[in-house]
Amino acid sequence: FFIKLVEICSEKHDIPIAMHLDHHEDYNEIINAIDIGTKSVMIDASHLDFEENIKKVQMVVEYAHKFDVTVEGELGILGGQEDDLVRDDKDSKYTNPAQAKEYVERTGIDSLAVAIGTAHGVYKEEPKLDFERLAEIRAVVDIPLVLHGASGVPADQVKRAIDLGITKVNIATELKMPFAETLREVLINNPNESDPRKYFGPAKESMKKVAIEKILMCGSNGK
């Protein structure tokens, strides 16, 4: 139902909308998402060893490509928390350029999420991206590269990452926080308010403002 709703909105506003299933590890859940119409999926097997990662991703790619569904894989491990998935920063592991080349060739994925110094969630200190590593990956991998954990990364670093080959930038925390903060503020100031339109509206506007800022930062406006 939701997928059809989004498709209708896309047609009405004449803009491309990508329905993407992000960070899933379960093969059956990914297959189900494809079967109901999702056009882009991410299989996150980055926590597995190199060969197991490849094997699991190959299975998803084989099924997805039958239906012209694009697949994003991940090599390297980001610390922090993504929804219910928590990984300690000490377990983070940067993407190896040589492995990235082999990984892309053997899996047949359409885009690659790389670990170059970002993390999911809120940063304890300003992140410093490994641009040299990113350039090395770009030199041997010719598919779109994805930057996860971009919330809180300074704009100049994001822009440089894009210049060096990042095609997709994932931002969640910086969108969720203003939504939640505004929602709390409205309900605290209006404790008897029961109309969802009155408290969700301002929250959505706060999120929208940040979304516009990020779209402009990435140079994605009008595309």
Regions from the language model: what does each represent?
Residues 116, 148-151:
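Short catalytic/ligand-gating loop segments at beta-alpha or beta-beta junctions
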Residues 18-22, 71-72, 146-148:
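Structural detector of well-ordered beta-strand residues that form the stable sheet scaffold
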Residues 200-203, 207-211:
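Family-specific functional microsites
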Residues 192-200:
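Short beta-alpha connecting loops at secondary-structure transitions
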Residues 2-13, 23-141, 155-171, 177, ...:
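Alpha/beta enzyme core
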